[in-house]
Structures are given as structure tokens and as C-alpha cells.
Amino acid sequence: MRSKFKDEHPFEKRKAEAERIRQKYPDRIPVICEKADRTDIPTIDKKKYLVPSDLTVGQFVYVIRKRIKLAPEKAIFIFVDEVLPPTAALMSAIYEEHKDEDNFLYVSYSGENTFGQEGWVELPVDDMDKAFICVSAAKKHWVWVLCDVRSSYQNCVLIVPLVQRPVLHTHSSFLSVSFALLFV
């Protein structure tokens, strides 16, 4: 997505502003947040944010939701370089990995997974108990588990909607599928 902020402000001015901000507030991240094209989600009232470096992506999404007065039942997705970042990631880590050459972090948001691909991805699951945990956590998002019962559940495959890059987490030996911001 092309940034309107970049179109409206020359590179030298953006870079100088970001450097000034980083010098004055070294524990803050300069973020430009813009609505993605072709989405019916409300437009945010301001684009520039100084985000604490220890804020998580999920907490930042909460700030955006409040700024645009989005109803709790409505989905919101944020993208950095057209990728859904993990909600538990610190904004400082996202900044270090994805900051622009002008030293701003560009974030876009949408009511749909506009950069996701259509289709499905299969993920092998080695334990049926783990597979049921996945299904119970994400059943309203069309997650299915296919198992070959003739092989005593040894060949289970978790099938999930392809959301850019599905993220797998293992916590206490439980497998869970992160659907980025669907649960925020």
C-alpha cells in the first residue's frame, strides 16, 4: 500500500522529523497509521503517533480501535509491510524489523484481511488432543481438523484459512493457531 503521508511530505522532511523525535523521545517509536484502500472501516483522526517502545501490537490495535470508535464485534487488521504482525510482539521489535528508510514505522489498518491470500494451508498435528485445542480456540473462524481414524489419530492435519502467514505458537506443549488480530 502506498502511504498518503509519504506522498504529502518529502523524504528529507520526514527523515528529519523522525530523527528529531527519536532524539527527543528515545523510548518512543514514531508511527504513521493510515487506513488501507477500499475498506469501509472508519478513518482515523490523526496519522502520527508516538508509541511507547514496550507497547505490544495488540495494545496498539486497542488504541486504534478507540480512536476510530470501532464496535467491539467488528474486526480490525493492522499491517506492517503488508504482513499481519503478531499481537504479542513489542512495537519496538516491529519497528527495528520494519522501519522505513525515513525512520518512521508505517502501519495500515483495515476491516478486512486485504493482503491475505485466498485458500487454505495444512499444518501437521502430531497429537489429537492438541488438535482439539486448536479447534476449540478458533472454531468460529472455520478451522477444521482432518484425521485418518484408521491410524489411531497419528496422521492429523489442521486445516486453517490462509492468513498471509499463519503463525504457530507452542505454549506448555499446546499447539495454538494465532489468527493475528481476529480475536482482538
Curated annotation (Swiss-Prot):
Residues the UniProt record annotates as site (Cleavage): 116-117
InterPro entries in the record: Atg8-like (IPR004241), Ubiquitin-like_domsf (IPR029071)
One Pfam entry name: ATG8
UniProt keyword annotations, A-Z: Autophagy, Cytoplasmic vesicle, Lipoprotein, Membrane, Protein transport, Transport, Ubl conjugation pathway, Vacuole
Source organism phylogeny: Eukaryota, Fungi, Dikarya, Basidiomycota, Agaricomycotina
Localisation per UniProt entry: Cytoplasmic vesicle, Autophagosome membrane; Vacuole membrane
Processing and modification events after translation: The C-terminal 68 residues are removed to expose Gly-116 at the C-terminus. The C-terminal Gly is then amidated with phosphatidylethanolamine by an activating system similar to that for ubiquitin.
Record bears the keyword Membrane: yes
Function: Ubiquitin-like modifier involved in autophagosome formation. With ATG4, mediates the delivery of the autophagosomes to the vacuole via the microtubule cytoskeleton. Required for selective autophagic degradation of the nucleus (nucleophagy) as well as for mitophagy which contributes to regulate mitochondrial quantity and quality by eliminating the mitochondria to a basal level to fulfill cellular energy requirements and preventing excess ROS production. Participates also in membrane fusion events that take place in the early secretory pathway.
Gene3D superfamilies, sorted: Phosphatidylinositol 3-kinase Catalytic Subunit, Chain A, domain 1
Record-given protein name: Autophagy-related protein 8
Propeptide positions: 117-184
Membrane topology category: Lipid-anchor
Keyword Protein transport appears in the UniProt entry: yes
Sites of Phosphatidylethanolamine amidated glycine lipidation: 116
Family the UniProt entry places it in: Belongs to the ATG8 family.
GO BP terms, alphabetized: autophagy; protein transport
GO cellular component, one term: autophagosome membrane
Chief place of localization: membrane
